Design a protein with these regions (language model features):
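A generic "binding-loop/recognition-motif" signal
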Residues: 57, 77, 93-94, 102-103, ...
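Glycine- and acidic-residue-biased ligand/ion/polar-headgroup-sensing regions
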Residues: 57-69
Length: 121
């Protein structure tokens, strides 16, 4: 994780190794005191069904940098998103994705910072 606490910082994939989260899933994180962006690389698609819905108190935007996903949220029609699309998720709204392409890169931005994404110790 790159932390821009009191000066500008850059996240460079060649320098900052990805955190492996599971089979076909890795992320890189950059943050300030109030904002967090997460580059999420997903492989192993297409998936047969969406992930289970989840929610959190953080506001979120998701930019589809590559690939294609189906964005699902409670009470809304699923949105098919392609590279270049951006979606905003209010605090507390249950949501999930379904990978439609073989792989995708999503860039999630959260406010406030997702403390649960920060490794302790």
């Amino acid at each position: 994780m790159v932390y821009a606490k009191d000066k500008v910082a850059a996240l460079r994939p060649a320098v900052e190794p990805a955190e492996k989260l599971g089979e076909g899933l890795s992320r890189r994180i950059i943050r300030t005191n109030q904002l967090m962006s997460v580059a999420l690389d997903i492989e192993g698609g297409p998936w047969k069904e969406p992930e289970p819905l989840h929610s959190h108190p953080h506001e979120q935007t998701t930019y589809v940098a590559s690939g294609e996903v189906l964005f699902c949220s409670e009470g809304s029609t699923p949105e098919r998103l392609n590279a270049g699309d951006l979606i905003a998720i209010p605090s507390g709204v249950p949501h999930s994705i379904q990978l439609l392409s073989r792989s995708a890169r999503l860039v999630d931005t959260f406010h406030p910072v997702r403390e649960d994404f920060i490794k302790k110790g």
